[in-house]
Amino acid sequence: MAEHSAPVLEIDPKYGPFDKHTPMMQQYLRLKSGHPNTLVFYRMGDFYELFFEDAEKASRLLDITLTARGSSNGHPIRMAGIPFHAAEQYLAKLVKLGESVAICEQIGDPATAKGPVERKVVRVVTPGTLTDAALLSDKINNHLLAIAHLPAKRGAAPLIGLAWLNLVGGELRVMECSPDQLDRELERIRPAEVLADDATLNTIQVDVARTRLPDWHFDVEAGTRRLREQLGVASLVAFGAETLTAALAAAGALLNYAAATQGQSLRHVIGLTVEHESEFIGLDTATRRNLELTETLRGQESPTLFSLLDTCATSMGSRLLRHWLHHPLRDRAIPQARQQAIEVLLGGDWQTLRSTLRTLSDVERITGRLALLSARPRDLSSLRDTLARLPEIREELPQSDAAPLLIELYAALTLPEDAHALLQRAVMAEPAAMVRDGGVIARGYDADLDELRDISENCGQFLVDLEARERERTGIANLRVEYNRVHGFYIEVTNGQAAKVPDDYRRRQTLKNAERYITPELKAFEDKALSAQDRALSREKLLYEELLQKLLPHLAEFKRIAAALAQADVLATLAERAHALSWSRPTLTDAPGIELTRARHPVVEQQVEQFVANDCMLQEARKLLLITGPNMGGKSTFMRQTALVVLLAYVGAFVPAEAAVIGPIDRIFTRIGAADDLAGGRSTFMVEMTEAAAILHRATPNSLVLMDEIGRGTSTFDGLALAWAIARHLLSHNRSHTLFATHYFELTQLPQEFAQAANVHLSAVEHGDGIVFLHAVQEGPASQSYGLQVAQLAGVPQPVIRAARKRLAWLEQHSADTGATPQLDLFALAADMPIVDEGDADAETPDSALADALAGIDPDDMTPREALDALYRLKALASPAA
């Protein structure tokens, strides 16, 4: 991703002597000096122009034409441009590439300017400070995050302070963590842009746009003052942030940077949330990836848990749902309150509520743009129309003492009558997209504007009347009175009628077949009409700016409403999903353990015709389940579904199970799948061991651990030894709730040593040479792994299968004769094994050829003649010497 540094105000010497440049280029270079590492969009008429190296870079990134026009300081000026009305699509592409763009607008009047028109940078668009709807994803929050790294003092450990802001939503959060937790927190927050000093940025492993700030930006005292000023308080004690020195340093740098990019204060940032790791069920990077919460293992958006659940009626709801899925809570009170609300909604008319919610606009983001004075006319009309629906939504929210959360939402959705009345009076029913086009302020809101509009809008009738009078006065029947933008108002007379033109007509334009004239009366009207139109647009722009200012005192009300609407939407959506998918309300309890009855994998269930539900029992006396069975038998699905049921329960949703009783959970760990990290220089086995080490160091008795085939990335001896030792450690030291899938059948002896371990297996049955997976979890270990049958299903060539079958038969016979375990003695016995190549396997016995021939016969699809021929072939195979 692109990296940027903070602005430094000096003219780059590479541009040559400053006084050798033209006045316009001097103006550009002054502006560019404030943004040396940022692309500058320099407004010139209807285009944004880029110059010098900015033009070259933009030409390459945007695939636009690079030209050279004129010269400055004796050299051609390289330039590239984009139409101002198409700027958003180009900005979107640049931001996606991690670039930042300074928007430089004309703020002076070209008609009165002496020299270059006055210009200034009105805002800087960076990946983390997007506010335009066209640049933002509807369903993902866009976070700007700052990192402050405070060195260790007096033997204390060094501290990392994090502060992150959803700029358009106005949500500011802070926390502190240790350096080794930094990447994990960045994976959780998923910022669009990170601010930090050089040393800190060099330690980050996460792929994200980075902006380098000097160390002095991260000052604790300055950060504390800046945050108090932003929140309008004398102390941060009430927020629980007064002692979080590293977080305060990060918050100060964050707020200053965000305000600088917007060119104004952040009026809507009026609250602060302090997060602590202990609030949430811990989900590390591997767990978020393996559970496919919002992204599949292949990096796709679907099918995931989020894509299954997100039938939200509003974008606000979708963003909140995504946040909830990544932040399951340890405290049972909030999830239980959500589940109570869902249960009450299911007993009411949640369908009507969802239908009404679908008509609403994105109040959260409109509020952010309003606070930044960048709200457009249709933002205001959408806000007005959404506010008008609040009484209806309140009526549709069921009220019950059994669901206090719904009562809170009802109160939060009170209509702000003053703000709504103002919007109703001020904004047209269907305003223009941009205020510069006019047609935004409603008639009756301002008498002066109405008068100017009347003059402008009555032009049509005046022209009709004038045309009729002039035809009668001159006797020219085809005389026309018209208007165009270039020549204004005129009277057009064809050349054949030129002799009838009166003396008071003054020629304005000559055409091939006609002449255009102006009269004193028409000129006077033109001056009045065009002046009225211009003055009306100016008046409307002024009124619109005043309207934005009048709405600012209502920001807190709008934010409250947006938060309540988002919650109502998510709860109604989870009710709809529970109804549609036959999910049940879980029971969250103090007693340790996980008891799931007929649980299903929420996503996989939707991808198959028939899903086999399974129970899962983890208690104090049954801490670890050793799961054996064939590949494709469902071991990984069983483990993942258990974790997803637990996660959904602590999100506050209903769960895909007939019943679920779940005790306290502090973290969910997963070690599933095989993947290397070539860029990081780590093999598959190294990745596996790194993840296993993290689990062994951090898992507690209240953690849920999923271990899938640990140790498979090395030799049999090493892998089995490690798997055995890891399972023992989880039982004796971590004592976590553990699902441990393995193909090492030797591990099934573990319950003989530890009473808290139990064997379960995924069942399968052989059918001829094939295998049928039953996907049912049963007590006890599996009898075999069915590896050859799975290989056959995968399409491994028959000669390879036959060779493997012969080698397996020898291993099993040797094991029976010596009492050795095939897995343990695999390498020790290598020298004693018979050598069987594929050619030997192909010709090994008539029985194998006969079996292959029989497998290829479909008796139901043969004629009598074909059946007789097949019988002769089989007889020949059975007695080849005949």
From Swiss-Prot:
One Gene Ontology term, aspect cellular component: cytosol
Positions contributing to ATP binding: 629-636
Molecular function GO labels: ATP binding; ATP-dependent DNA damage sensor activity; damaged DNA binding; mismatched DNA binding
Pfam families for this protein: MutS_I, MutS_II, MutS_III, MutS_IV, MutS_V
GO BP terms: mismatch repair
Alphabetic keyword roster: ATP-binding, DNA damage, DNA repair, DNA-binding, Nucleotide-binding
Top-level lineage group: Bacteria
Family: Belongs to the DNA mismatch repair MutS family.
Task of the protein: This protein is involved in the repair of mismatches in DNA. It is possible that it carries out the mismatch recognition step. This protein has a weak ATPase activity.
The protein, known as: DNA mismatch repair protein MutS
Record organism: Ralstonia pickettii (strain 12J)
Gene name for this UniProt entry: mutS
